């Protein structure tokens, strides 16, 4: 267990930073997505768990967690503007895109492990792209249906 935490200390630190940022943001401005603090924890924690399920090398989960945090940040930013009229459904659109993001993270995690990628920048980028591509594909699928 100690080796797991030591090897993934940057990944865990990125997750903790995003949780702290969203906690402060909700405390200061309120929950503009109207979904509760538990959702922010679940998205960031879920991205970390999905990345670790693929058993990749360290730094992969950090990229996935960063992408999850940025996706939430974009949704919070869009919904906090007074010009947006989302009827409170923007959080549901984010929620429905998470299965695709998880599938993308697991798929690229398996690819990175089988290809034996060793460079940290490549692993970090693969985690980020796995979440991002899966999320975007699911978003496009939601809006085409």
Predicted regions and their residues:
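Short alpha-helical packing/oligomerization segments
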Residues: 77-110
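Canonical alpha-helical transmembrane segments
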Residues: 39-65, 108-110
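Short juxtamembrane and helix-loop transition motifs at transmembrane-helix boundaries
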Residues: 1-5, 17-32, 52-59, 83-91
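Interfacial loop-to-transmembrane junctions
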Residues: 113-132
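Membrane-embedded alpha-helical segments in integral membrane proteins
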Residues: 13-30, 72-80, 138-139
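Alpha-helical transmembrane segments
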Residues: 7-23, 64-71, 129-132
């Amino acid at each position: 267990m100690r080796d797991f935490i030591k090897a993934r200390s940057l990944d865990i630190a990125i997750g903790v930073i995003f949780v702290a940022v969203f906690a402060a943001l909700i405390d200061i401005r309120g929950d503009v997505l109207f979904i509760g603090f538990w959702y922010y924890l679940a998205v960031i924690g879920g991205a970390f768990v999905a990345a670790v399920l693929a058993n990749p090398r360290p730094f992969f989960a950090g990229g996935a967690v960063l992408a999850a945090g940025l996706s939430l940040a974009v949704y919070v930013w869009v919904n906090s503007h007074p010009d947006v009229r989302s009827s409170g459904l923007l959080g549901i659109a984010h929620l429905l895109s998470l299965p695709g993001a998880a599938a993308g993270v697991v798929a690229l995690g398996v690819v990175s492990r089988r290809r034996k990628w060793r460079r940290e920048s490549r692993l970090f980028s693969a985690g980020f792209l796995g979440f991002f591509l899966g999320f975007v594909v699911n978003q496009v699928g939601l809006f085409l249906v």
